[in-house]
């Protein structure tokens, strides 16, 4: 996997956004206030990463952790 793909992101101000982000690179997201930068970074990418990490843990360990909602993506 050389890229992180986001398809159809619909979190807060994001309206069916598709993007490909290269892995192991420094990425900068810029835009106007309210354009969805934080929605992309925290509510989509971070939330999905945390969800996948927690799902990889044992059922015993998962019971002690709160899980973020799955992002609204395709």
Swiss-Prot record:
Name the residues that bind ATP: 31-38
What cellular-component terms does GO give this entry?
A: cytoplasm
Molecular function via GO = ATP binding; DNA binding; nuclease activity
Keywords for this protein: ATP-binding, Cytoplasm, DNA damage, DNA excision, DNA repair, DNA-binding, Excision nuclease, Nucleotide-binding, Repeat, SOS response
Q: Which SUPFAM superfamilies match?
A: P-loop containing nucleoside triphosphate hydrolases
Q: Which InterPro entries match?
A: P-loop_NTPase
Reply yes or no: does the keyword DNA damage apply: yes
Coarse class of the primary localization is cytoplasm
Keyword Cytoplasm carried by entry: yes
Q: Where in the cell is it found?
A: Cytoplasm
Q: Single Gene Ontology BP term?
A: DNA repair
Subunit arrangement?
Forms a heterotetramer with UvrB during the search for lesions.
What family does this belong to?
A: Belongs to the ABC transporter superfamily. UvrA family.
The entry's function note states: The UvrABC repair system catalyzes the recognition and processing of DNA lesions. UvrA is an ATPase and a DNA-binding protein. A damage recognition complex composed of 2 UvrA and 2 UvrB subunits scans DNA for abnormalities. When the presence of a lesion has been verified by UvrB, the UvrA molecules dissociate.
User: Know the name of this protein?
Assistant: UvrABC system protein A
Which species does the entry assign this protein to? Serratia marcescens
- Name of the coding gene: uvrA
């Amino acid at each position: 996997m050389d890229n992180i793909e986001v398809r159809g992101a619909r979190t807060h101000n994001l309206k069916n956004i598709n993007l490909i982000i290269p892995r192991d690179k420094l990425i900068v997201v810029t835009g106007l206030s309210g354009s969805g930068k934080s929605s992309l970074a925290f509510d989509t990418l971070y939330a999905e990463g945390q969800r996948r990490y927690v799902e990889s843990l044992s059922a015993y360990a998962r019971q002690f952790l709160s899980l973020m909602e799955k992002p609204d993506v395709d």
